[in-house]
Design a protein with these regions (language model features):
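Beta-lactam-recognizing serine transpeptidase/beta-lactamase-like catalytic domain environment
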Residues: 61-63, 223-266, 271-505
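Periplasmic/cell-envelope proteins involved in peptidoglycan metabolism and beta-lactam response
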Residues: 1-243, 337-342, 460, 477, ...
Length: 530
């Protein structure tokens, strides 16, 4: 081989060696490449998104009351077999699918399994087994966003999208590298919570009483002086952690009955009484033969029982339909409708941005020009539909001395760590609807309903109460028998009202426990410090 060829060969070898050295130097000094290489040996697992909780008026949690557990599973561990009894059906199916996986994963388990030698992490369980105010609070979708109720209305406040993450150094087979431990990295920011006006103790007492006494219906309890709602119950309930089962369940469990519109019946009669007192017609007296006839149409009192000579007090105590038809004629449709509108009938209410109660139906003035329509309207039937929330607002106005306080459900956002109030969310408003003297007279009249009239079952064990019964026809039938809505709306104590309470049982033939009797039990619970 000539010297020239040898030199060329050595030159080529030298250049190749130099290229290798340069490449090695570049690999060692290039941090981006090093980071990418390291990332290929790190598994990052995301825990469920953090979400702010709901709190009651005293700062007690209404959601996030318990914990659930996530077990960290690595390929090649016998933890799969150990975890199988602690997983639900979906989790067991996942264990089977992932038995030959090459990556770690998190598995929902029913309890802390760290005693089995498996790494386990606690995460908040959003809803308890017996959740409180589930129709009001609502539920989440599969992505952790609010799908209904206040969860949906306040999703922008409660959901941040931030998640805690687990960083695991793993081998090519997805197993944890020897000598390393998973690192839990906390989210950068915490979500805000929301304080509601509900009282957890009162809500729980009302829900327990409803479960014992009602098949379908609702309960509302309001603080008279502020309009703040302390309890909002709707039956039947549902499991917020498994909403799918309730979508087609009987009784429409996802429906919040407190915000839905129903035939009102005689619970509407205090509206006419207020209009009469304001117009100076509170002394109107009528002889009741047990019915009222108009243009060939007969409007009967309950059981067609004659009530004799009755004034406003006796008409409320006996719930005399004929009296209120005649009183309505004396007042005129415009006066009665105006009072109903001032008390909130015919208008929906914003519970929170994006969550609104039904408006119900307040018949138009033109409709009430028809004498038959107006006659039905005067005792709460016909086209009139009202929500329990509207009825509560009306009764609370009487209890509060003639001042209408908008019923409130939401107070403010709070710091999840300290409980400190951050941003007010309540938009309270108050307005005078009728004179204080009118309210005082109505309070005495409605106390008479409980003491002497159709509402005697509403009498509490201690003290006195006031209110009005209502049995509303629905036009719906079951096995040939008409379904009715059974109401009691009132306040307690009668002398110095503190609580306004509405009990409504819908679509019943005859409830096992009357709404008035449930009202009395609620008064007793409140008196005992519920």
């Amino acid at each position: 081989m000539s010297g020239r060829r040898v030199l060329a060969l050595y030159g080529a070898l030298l250049l190749g060696f130099a290229a290798v050295v340069c490449r090695l130097y570049w690999l060692c000094s290039n941090t981006e490449y090093a980071v990418r290489a390291a990332a290929q040996s790190e598994a990052v697992l995301r825990l469920p998104a953090a979400r702010g909780n709901f709190y009651d008026c005293d700062g007690l949690p209404l959601t996030g009351l318990s914990q659930s557990w996530l077990a960290l599973c690595f390929p090649g561990e016998d933890s799969y077999a150990r975890l199988y009894p602690y997983a639900d059906a979906d989790g067991q199916a996942r264990l089977y699918r992932e038995r030959n996986t090459s990556r770690p994963f998190l598995l929902d388990v029913v309890q802390d399994v760290s005693g089995l030698g498996v790494r386990c992490y606690a995460v908040p369980r959003r809803y308890a087994a017996a959740p409180l105010a589930e129709q009001l609070i609502g539920y989440l979708d599969s992505e952790g966003h609010g799908a209904a109720g206040l969860e949906a209305a306040l999703d922008d406040v409660l959901y941040t999208g931030e998640r805690d993450t687990l960083h695991c150094a793993v081998t090519a087979q997805g197993r944890l590298q020897r000598g390393s431990e998973p690192i839990l990295e906390k989210a950068d920011s915490a979500p805000q919570g929301v304080r509601l006006t509900l009282s957890r103790s009162i809500q729980r007492a009302a829900e327990g009483m409803a479960a014992e006494s009602m098949a379908t219906g609702c309960i509302l309890i309001i603080d008279v002086s502020s309009g703040k709602v302390r309890a909002c119950v709707s039956l039947p309930g549902f499991d917020a952690a498994n909403v799918g089962e309730s979508l087609t369940a009987p009784g429409s469990p996802l429906l919040n009955r407190a915000f839905s519109a129903y035939a009102a019946g005689s619970v509407f009669k205090p509206v006419l009484a207020a209009a009469a007192l304001e117009a100076g017609e509170g002394d109107f007296i009528r002889e009741c033969p047990g019915y009222d006839a108009l243009n060939g149409q007969v409007y009967r009192c309950a059981g067609s029982v004659p009530h004799g000579l009755v004034g406003l007090d006796g008409a409320l105590e006996k719930s005399c339909n004929g009296y209120f038809i005649e009183l309505g004629r004396k007042l005129g449709p415009e006066r009665v409708r105006k009072m109903a509108a001032a008390l909130g009938f015919g208008k929906g209410q914003d519970i929170a941005d994006g969550l609104r109660s039904a408006s119900g139906v307040l018949p138009e003035a033109e409709t009430l020009e028809n004498e038959g329509q107006f006659a039905n309207f005067c005792f709460g039937q016909g086209e009139l539909l009202a929500t329990p929330l509207q009825v509560a607002g009306m009764m609370n106005t009487i209890a509060a001395g003639g001042v209408y306080h908008t019923p409130l459900f939401v107070e403010c956002t709070v710091d999840e760590t300290t409980g400190e109030e951050l941003t007010p969310l309540a938009h309270s408003s108050s307005r005078r609807v009728f004179a204080e003297q009118t309210a005082e007279k109505l309070q005495k009249l409605l106390a008479g309903v409980v003491a002497e009239g159709t509402g005697q079952q509403a009498a509490p064990s201690e003290g006195t109460a006031a209110g009005k019964t209502g049995t509303a026809q629905t036009g719906q039938f079951r096995d040939g028998e008409e379904l009715k809505n059974y109401w009691f709306a009132g306040f307690y104590p009668a002398e110095k009202p503190r609580w306004t309470i509405v009990v409504m049982q819908d679509a019943q033939t005859e409830p096992e426990v009357s709404s008035a009797a449930i009202f009395a039990r609620l008064c007793d619970a409140l008196s005992a410090g519920a």
